[in-house]
Structures are given as structure tokens and as C-alpha cells.
């Protein structure tokens, strides 16, 4: 049952790879069809800019490189990733085909050349052309050239006058580094643009291009000055696309991930500078990528102690050291004369914690100097196996074969197809230990690792040197009057503080309740010299009273108006240097330095076997300051340092915890009414707030090492969900948030625990030690006084000269429509306009009655209708005699006739004579 999930995962991966291979095959099989149709049409058919599935010329298919690889003429190699296939073109293969077979009608006026390739070995230093079109005499008409000695890329083209023109892209050393790169050139009518690894490098203007001749040949990988010699290189992808804007949409996801890079637009060449002096020693290299943790090795023998190094720069403040022993009480000094008006006294004992709203995060402190380089740690666990080395140089040329070969390999028979994979061999014996290899070159800076686990709490470290005083924070909002805190016990006498920076004027605070009179305190030492203040108003003469102890902390009043600064005090004694601090934590990343000149890439050496750890060498001189490295793993707890000497009294620290309640002192004499006290000290930090907003991106970094480009592979199907990655590094510090609204007054909390005398002594000693170096630093430079209070605003100055015209501002928002202006003057008659569009039908007009028109043509016959019967017409004239009609039918027999006797006989004789009688 345990292996069921493995079988399921295996079947899922097989189906994923099958669909990916099928999609890749279908995508590759489409291109020759497009190319075949492409050659039978015009240069580039009617296209829409922005489409990727447009006709083009696939040079790998046109030069039949895949066929040559199947015959063993060229070698198939792994491309920019494990899923990509590339071809290694050797120096003995002649890739030359007639131009008319690819570009039967020549090249279009606008197109783009794209290729993913890699140069290795001696090719990096050669001046060669990766693609070229020659005329019938072998002269170059169009080509893309790579100039190894000059570290530049050239685009050559035939001009209108027939001369060869060249556009050169200079200062590209990152292209010549034995890595996979994606080179794309966008050729337009009047300009040509170079892209390397999907980053725009430069756009150059070009002259009009002439029409090329298709009577010559197209070649790949030739020397520029001797086109008969082939140059070895590896190619993964090489099309010519009909869309000149294709490089702007191309991605570089198939290139291996490397250090992020930033390509800066090349500026105008500056004048040659004078030769500089020899530079200082180089900074230490960047740490390599951490290997995975291996098995724990046996403990090694302890190494000898190195020589003591020179004193390093002061480190950042370390963790608070162990509490020192309490010193003996000093003898009381003699009563001194009445001093002048001093600075406001230290704040009273800490009140009960309030529950205010979380304030905005304060600004980050300045980064301190790095500590001294520590001793070398024990040998680390062995890392992962390094990447495979670069391909070796080509072997010697083989002997001439005995048979005639293929036209593409005339002197050798192609090897047979690769056989099936053999069975897995037996496990070999453990080899003998190899010799120690040479030290490899400095590796690239590794990517920032994920957040490591929280280390165990280390032992108390020695006391570090106090850090630099932070910048003055912004004035907080005026808080509401809080509830009166419980009276704390009298705290220990604090030392006078150095003059603080001038704070912003706060609102006038409410008058706090008068504090109870405290017991008499001992006289403090003289403070540091303050800046000379303005003469104050004369105060009321009071009685000379005995200085009393600080009273219990009264209710905090609202900030009052800053008082005048007192006269300077006597300078203090110089303090002894404090103990050397441990190296501080990693500081914030500094601003990017000025980009240095790019050096020539060296030839990569073969990776040697991992050598044994050598003996510990003598300690070298301290190197120059290196770049901040990544945060290392938590170190082992250090040993306790020796007890340090008691330093001079330091500057006053933050208020201590409330002291234990002392015995009630005897009633003192009533003192004069005290002046308004200074604002109380800032309370302890509140609870950890929510995560702040993401900050703005940092300043633009310097030019990084270029990444390896590669061609864009086919889009794969969706992969299996990956494992959850390591937690990323914390983001950049966010901007300081807006000032929050004042919180409501908190309710009075429970009484805190009364601290012990030992705890109070520890706090005082810690504060004195933290402020010790700041006091010593101020005493070492007495010629610079503390900054004085800002003066009153001066009178307005005279108006300055008019400034230069600024850059045009951003387009403002659309303004409101203005008021209707007065009618303008009648303009001059303009030129006759163009005929307008046909207007809509107008309303019927009223015209003057016109003259009768000419008689119209007879109309068409009307539709039949029923009319009324008309009147009888007038008798007409007799008509024309008609034609004889058809004889009618025989009439009925007539009546019997009669005749007169005289006429009857004559008619009978006539009838008898007229008849043709036959017979009797």
C-alpha cells in the first residue's frame, strides 16, 4: 500500500510528459507548412502586427540541421534547459544553401532576426558572422556579426547605392561568456534595435536599405574576414519573422535563472580620462551558494591560534553584558556654591504602563561599521556536486573514410542510429582519492536564501560600544491627560544629560498637579558644556534652600514651550576607551556603488576534484572593507569576557524601573515653587504591531552580471503542484505611516512589582556603560560644540533671479467648463468648403406661382373602373359598305303564287328553254 502513491505519481508524470511531447511535436510540425506556403507568396503576406503565428523563415529547417544531426554530421546537445534540444555546429561542416531556396523574392523591408545560441572556446575571441546572405560573387549583402575582440554586435545591410552599411552595438562584454543567450534584432524602415536576453539594449538609425540579390548563397557560422572557414557554435533556435515588433513580445523563460541584471541605456561617449593610480586590493568575493547539509563529520583537531590582528573599527552595539559589581559609595563632597539655572532634571520614576494605540514605526537607524573578521570556523559540511564543466576543445580531425558519403558529409560515412539504452551497470568500486584541484574562480553571488530557523538563545555576550545617536523623531500628537499614576519610590540620582537636539515646538501642556516634596538628594557632577543661550527674564529671588531629592513623578504634563539654554558647563574629563565590542549584526544594504568597468571574461577552467582541507595558514593582513555578505547561521555561544574597568560616568539613560519604597524621610523645609517640569520621557515600546505596508522599492542597483539568454521554448502543460518553497527573505522596510489619532486615556493599571535594589543598580550600570563611548567621543573633540537652538526666523530675503524653466509637469485634471466668452469679430470669407453630406428632407416651402409648362406626354392608361351610363349619342353617318356575307340558311316556303294568263305561258316557255332536261 505504501508504494501506491509512487505508482500514481509515476503514471501522472508519464501522462504529463506525453501531452507535452505531443504538443511540442504538433507545434514544430506546423512551422514547415507555414514556411512552405510562405515561399509561394509575396515577401510577407498581409499581416497584422502583434500576431506570433505569422509566416517566417525557420533557418534550422531550411538548412536541414535536424537531418544532418540524424546522420551524425552535427551533434545534438542539451539546450538552455533540460527540455530544449540544440545543435553543435562544428568547424568541418559547410552550411551553405542557395538564397533563392529560402527567400525567393528577397527579404522584406521590415523583419526581425531571432536566435538562441552559445559561444564556447576560441569562438569567444573571434570576429565572425552567425547569419549572412552573399551575392553571386561572395560579397556580403545582409548579416549579423559578432565581434569578440571588441565585444560588440554588428548588423550589416546593403544600401540603396549598393555599398555595405553597418550598425554597431558596442560595449556588450556580458554576451561573450560561454552562456546561452537570446539575441534578437528588430529591423525597421529607418532604425534597427538590439535585444539581448529580452532586454532592449539600444536603437540605432539606419539609412534606406537596397534590394538584395537572390543569386548567391546564405551561410551560417563563418569568419567575418574569411567566409570560407566555418566557426563552431551551438544553436537552439533561429527564425526570421515577418513582424519587426516580435522581439518586444518575446519572453526568456527558457533561459536558466541567473543573477538579476539591469541594462542601462548607453549614454554619449565621454572624453578620455587621465590614467588612474594603481587601485587598492580587490574586495573579497561574494559567498557562493550554500550546499545542502551533509552528514556530520568527525570532529577535527583543534587548529593553532592565529596571530593577533589589528584593532578593527568599532562594531555595532552588542547585547547587554552581564551586570557589573556595585561600586562602593563615594564620600560626600563639600557643599558647592549655588549653581546657575540648570537643564531640566531627569524624568521621574516610571509610571504604570498605559494602554495607548500603537504608534507608527520609527525610522531605521544608520548602519554601523562592520566588526573585525573572526577566526575561521570549523570545516563546513560538503556541498552539492558542482555543475558540469564546459565542453572540451574539439578533437583532432579523423582520417578520410573509404567510401563516398552523403552530399552533406562527403568524406565520412554517417554513423548508424543510436542503439537502445544498455542495462544498468554494476556498482563500481570506490576510487582512490584524487589529487587536490586548483582553486576555482569566484562563483556568482548566490540568490538570497530563505529565512532560517530561529537559533537557540546564545549566552550573554560582552558589552558592545554604544551605537550612534538616532535621528530626532517627529513630534507625536498631543495626548489626552492620563490618569494619575501611583507614587513611585525615589529613584537613584541621575547624571546630567548632554543637550538634546532641538525638538519641534509642542502644544502647551496643562499644568500638572504639584508633586510631593522628596527627600534631599546628593549633588550631581557638572554637566557637559551646553550652547550659549539667550538671556532669560530675571526670576524672583528665592531663599537659598537645600537641594532636595527628586520627588515622586507627578502626573505627566503636556509639552511646554522650550526654555532658554543655560550657559556652558565645565568640560569633563576624557574617558578611557571602552571594551572592544563583538561584531554587530548585519547592517542594512547600502546604496549601490558606481558601476565599475566590465573586465574581459576569462576562459573557464575545468573543475578539479575537491581537495583536502589544508593546514591553517598564517594570519594575513586585514583586507579592505568587503560588501555586506548574507546573514550567517547563528554562532555558538561565546565565552564570558573578563571583568572590565569601571568607566567614567555616562550620559543619562532612559528612566529606570520604579525603585523600592524607601522609609519616610524627615520633613524638609518648604522650598520655593518649582518651575514647570520638562516633558516626561518616552515610555517603553508598545506591543509588537501588525506587519507594516510594503515599502517602496529600493534605489536602482548597479549593473549586475548578465544572465544567460536562451530561446523561448514551447509552452508546456500545467505541471504538478510543487512543494511549498522556503520562506522568502523579509521585504524592504515600509515607509513611515501617517501619524495616528491620539488614543483614549488608558485605565489605571495594577501596581507594578517593586524592583529590588540589585535590579536598580544593574539598570543604572547598564545605562552608564551604554552612554560611555558617546561621552568619550564628545570629549575627544572639544572644538566642536553641541548644536545650538535654532534661531528665530529671519526676515524675508530679497526676491531671487528668475529660475530656469522647469520640466513640463504632468497633465493636470480636466478643468471645469469656462464661462461663455463674448462674440468674436466677423472673420474674413473663407475658401469654398468641400461638398457636404446629403441633408435630411426639409419642410415644404411656399414658392411664387410659375408659368404653365409645355404639354406633357400622354399618360399611361388608367385602371378599369365602373362609370355611370352616358347619354345617347348623335346618329352617325352611314358606314362603308361591308363585304358580302355568308349565304343564310334556306327560308321557309312561301305562299302559293298566282299570275295573269298572259304572262304565265311566256314565263313557262322561258323556264323550259333554260333547263337541261334529259329524257322525255
From Swiss-Prot:
InterPro entries: Collagen, Collagen_Structural_Proteins, ConA-like_dom_sf, TSPN-like_N
Pfam families (alphabetical): Collagen (PF01391)
Superkingdom, natural source: Eukaryota
Annotated Low complexity bias: 364-378, 601-628, 637-649, 804-825, 851-864
Ranges for region Nonhelical region (N-Terminal) (NC4): 24-266
Signal peptide coordinates: 1-26
Gene3D superfamilies per UniProt: 2.60.120.200
Keywords of the record: Collagen, Disulfide bond, Extracellular matrix, Hydroxylation, Repeat, Secreted, Signal
Domain called Laminin G-like: residue spans: 50-244
Post-translational modification: Covalently linked to the telopeptides of type II collagen by lysine-derived cross-links. Prolines at the third position of the tripeptide repeating unit (G-X-Y) are hydroxylated in some or all of the chains.
Bias-annotated ranges (Basic and acidic residues): 432-448, 826-843
Biased composition range(s): Pro residues: 269-283, 379-396, 790-802, 886-898
Compositionally biased intervals (Gly residues): 485-506
Example of a GO MF term: extracellular matrix structural constituent conferring tensile strength
Residue pairs linked by disulfide bridges in the UniProt entry: 44-242, 198-252
Region (Disordered) residue spans: 264-462, 476-757, 782-920
Chain ranges of the Collagen-like domain: 267-323, 324-355, 356-401, 414-470, 554-612, 613-642, 653-711, 712-753, 788-842
CC per GO annotation: collagen type IX trimer; collagen-containing extracellular matrix; extracellular space
Subcellular location(s) of the protein: Secreted, Extracellular space, Extracellular matrix
Domain notes: Each subunit is composed of three triple-helical domains interspersed with non-collagenous domains. The globular domain at the N-terminus of type IX collagen molecules represents the NC4 domain which may participate in electrostatic interactions with polyanionic glycosaminoglycans in cartilage.
Subunit composition and interactions: Heterotrimer of an alpha 1(IX), an alpha 2(IX) and an alpha 3(IX) chain.
Entry similarity comment: Belongs to the fibril-associated collagens with interrupted helices (FACIT) family.
Protein role: Structural component of hyaline cartilage and vitreous of the eye.
Protein name per the record: Collagen alpha-1(IX) chain
Gene from which the chain derives: COL9A1
Amino acid at each position: 500500500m505504501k508504494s501506491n502513491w509512487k505508482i500514481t505519481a509515476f503514471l501522472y508524470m508519464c501522462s504529463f510528459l506525453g501531452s507535452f511531447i505531443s504538443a511540442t511535436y504538433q507545434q514544430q510540425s506546423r512551422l514547415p507548412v507555414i514556411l512552405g506556403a510562405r515561399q509561394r507568396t509575396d515577401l510577407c503576406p498581409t499581416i497584422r502586427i502583434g500576431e506570433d503565428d505569422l509566416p517566417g523563415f525557420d533557418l534550422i529547417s531550411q538548412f536541414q540541421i535536424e537531418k544532418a544531426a540524424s546522420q551524425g554530421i552535427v551533434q545534438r546537445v542539451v539546450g538552455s534547459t533540460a527540455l530544449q534540444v540544440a545543435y553543435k555546429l562544428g568547424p568541418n561542416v559547410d552550411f551553405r544553401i542557395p538564397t533563392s531556396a529560402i527567400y525567393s523574392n528577397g527579404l522584406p523591408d521590415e523583419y526581425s532576426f531571432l536566435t538562441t545560441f552559445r559561444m564556447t572556446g576560441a569562438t569567444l575571441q573571434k570576429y565572425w558572422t552567425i547569419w549572412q546572405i552573399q551575392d553571386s560573387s561572395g560579397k556580403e549583402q545582409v548579416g549579423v556579426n559578432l565581434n569578440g575582440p571588441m565585444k560588440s554586435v554588428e548588423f550589416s545591410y546593403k544600401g540603396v547605392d549598393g555599398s555595405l552599411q553597418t550598425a554597431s552595438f558596442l560595449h556588450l562584454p556580458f554576451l561573450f561568456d560561454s552562456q546561452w543567450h537570446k539575441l534578437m534584432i528588430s529591423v525597421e524602415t529607418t532604425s534597427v534595435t538590439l535585444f539581448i536576453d529580452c532586454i532592449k539594449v539600444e536603437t540605432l538609425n539606419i539609412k534606406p536599405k537596397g534590394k538584395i540579390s537572390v543569386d548567391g548563397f546564405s551561410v551560417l557560422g563563418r569568419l567575418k574576414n574569411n567566409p570560407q572557414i566555418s566557426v563552431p557554435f551551438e544553436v537552439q533556435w533561429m527564425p526570421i519573422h515577418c513582424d519587426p515588433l516580435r522581439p518586444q513580445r518575446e519572453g526568456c523563460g527558457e533561459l536558466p535563472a541567473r543573477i538579476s541584471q539591469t541594462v542601462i541605456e548607453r549614454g554619449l561617449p565621454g572624453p578620455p580620462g587621465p590614467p588612474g593610480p594603481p587601485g587598492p586590493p580587490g574586495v573579497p568575493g561574494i559567498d557562493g551558494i550554500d550546499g545542502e547539509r551533509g552528514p556530520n563529520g568527525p570532529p577535527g583537531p583543534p587548529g593553532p591560534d592565529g596571530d593577533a590582528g589589528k584593532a578593527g573599527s568599532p562594531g555595532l552595539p552588542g547585547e547587554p553584558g552581564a551586570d557589573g559589581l556595585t561600586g562602593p559609595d563615594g564620600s560626600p563632597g563639600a557643599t558647592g556654591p549655588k549653581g546657575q539655572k540648570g537643564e531640566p532634571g531627569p524624568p521621574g520614576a516610571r509610571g504604570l504602563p498605559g494602554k495607548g494605540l500603537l504608534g507608527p514605526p520609527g525610522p531605521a537607524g544608520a548602519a554601523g561599521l562592520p566588526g573585525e573578521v573572526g577566526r575561521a570556523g570549523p570545516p563546513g559540511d560538503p556541498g552539492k556536486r558542482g555543475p558540469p564543466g564546459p565542453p572540451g576543445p574539439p578533437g583532432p580531425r579523423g582520417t578520410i573514410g573509404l567510401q563516398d558519403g552523403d552530399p552533406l558529409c562527403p568524406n565520412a560515412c554517417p554513423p548508424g542510429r543510436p542503439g537502445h539504452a544498455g542495462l544498468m551497470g554494476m556498482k563500481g568500486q570506490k576510487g582512490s582519492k584524487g589529487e587536490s584541484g586548483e582553486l576555482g574562480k569566484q562563483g556568482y553571488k548566490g540568490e538570497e536564501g530563505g529565512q532560517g530557523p530561529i537559533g537557540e538563545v546564545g549566552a550573554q555576550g560582552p558589552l558592545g560600544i554604544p551605537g550612534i545617536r538616532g535621528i530626532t523623531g517627529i513630534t507625536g500628537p498631543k495626548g489626552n491627560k492620563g490618569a494619575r499614576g501611583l507614587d513611585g519610590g525615589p529613584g537613584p540620582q541621575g547624571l546630567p544629560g548632554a543637550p538634546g537636539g532641538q525638538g519641534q515646538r509642542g502644544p502647551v501642556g496643562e499644568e500638572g498637579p504639584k508633586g510631593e516634596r522628596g527627600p534631599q538628594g546628593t549633588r550631581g557632577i557638572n554637566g557637559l558644556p551646553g550652547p550659549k543661550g539667550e538671556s532669560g527674564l530675571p526670576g524672583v529671588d528665592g531663599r537659598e534652600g537645600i537641594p532636595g531629592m527628586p520627588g515622586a513623578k507627578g502626573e505627566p504634563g503636556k509639552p511646554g514651550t522650550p526654555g532658554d539654554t543655560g550657559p556652558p558647563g565645565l568640560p569633563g574629563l576624557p574617558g578611557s576607551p571602552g571594551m572592544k565590542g563583538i561584531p554587530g549584526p548585519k547592517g542594512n544594504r547600502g546604496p549601490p556603488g558606481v558601476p565599475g568597468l566590465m573586465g574581459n571574461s576569462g576562459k573557464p577552467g575545468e573543475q578539479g576534484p575537491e581537495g583536502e582541507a589544508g593546514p591553517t595558514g598564517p594570519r594575513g593582513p586585514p583586507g579592505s572593507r568587503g560588501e555586506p555578505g548574507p546573514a550567517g547561521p547563528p554562532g555558538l555561544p561565546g565565552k564570558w569576557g573578563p571583568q572590565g574597568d569601571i568607566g567614567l560616568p555616562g550620559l543619562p539613560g532612559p528612566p529606570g524601573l520604579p525603585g523600592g519604597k524607601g522609609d519616610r524621610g524627615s520633613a524638609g523645609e518648604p522650598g520655593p515653587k518649582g518651575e514647570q517640569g520638562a516633558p516626561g520621557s518616552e515610555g517603553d515600546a508598545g506591543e509588537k504591531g501588525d506587519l507594516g505596508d510594503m515599502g517602496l522599492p529600493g534605489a536602482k542597483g548597479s549593473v549586475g552580471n548578465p544572465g544567460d539568454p536562451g530561446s523561448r521554448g514551447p509552452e508546456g502543460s500545467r505541471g504538478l503542484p510543487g512543494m511549498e518553497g522556503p520562506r522568502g527573505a523579509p521585504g524592504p522596510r515600509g515607509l513611515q505611516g501617517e501619524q495616528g489619532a491620539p488614543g483614549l486615556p488608558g485605565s489605571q493599571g495594577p501596581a507594578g512589582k517593586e524592583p529590588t535594589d540589585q535590579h536598580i543598580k544593574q539598570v543604572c550600570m547598564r545605562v552608564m556603560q551604554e552612554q560611555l563611548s558617546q561621552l568619550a567621543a564628545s570629549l575627544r573633540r572639544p572644538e566642536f560644540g553641541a548644536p545650538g537652538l535654532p534661531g528665530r526666523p529671519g526676515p524675508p530675503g530679497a526676491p531671487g533671479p528668475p529660475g530656469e524653466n522647469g520640466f513640463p509637469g504632468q497633465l493636470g485634471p480636466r478643468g471645469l467648463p469656462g464661462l461663455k466668452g463674448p462674440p468674436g469679430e466677423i472673420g474674413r470669407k473663407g475658401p469654398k468648403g468641400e461638398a457636404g453630406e446629403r441633408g435630411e428632407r426639409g419642410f415644404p416651402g411656399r414658392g411664387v406661382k410659375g408659368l404653365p409648362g409645355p404639354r406633357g406626354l400622354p399618360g399611361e392608361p388608367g385602371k378599369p373602373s365602373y362609370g355611370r351610363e352616358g347619354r345617347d349619342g348623335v346618329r352617325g353617318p352611314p358606314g362603308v359598305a361591308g363585304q358580302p356575307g355568308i349565304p343564310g340558311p334556306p327560308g321557309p316556303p312561301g305562299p302559293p303564287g298566282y299570275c295573269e294568263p298572259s304572262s304565265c305561258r311566256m314565263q313557262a316557255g322561258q323556264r323550259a328553254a333554260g333547263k337541261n332536261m334529259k329524257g322525255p
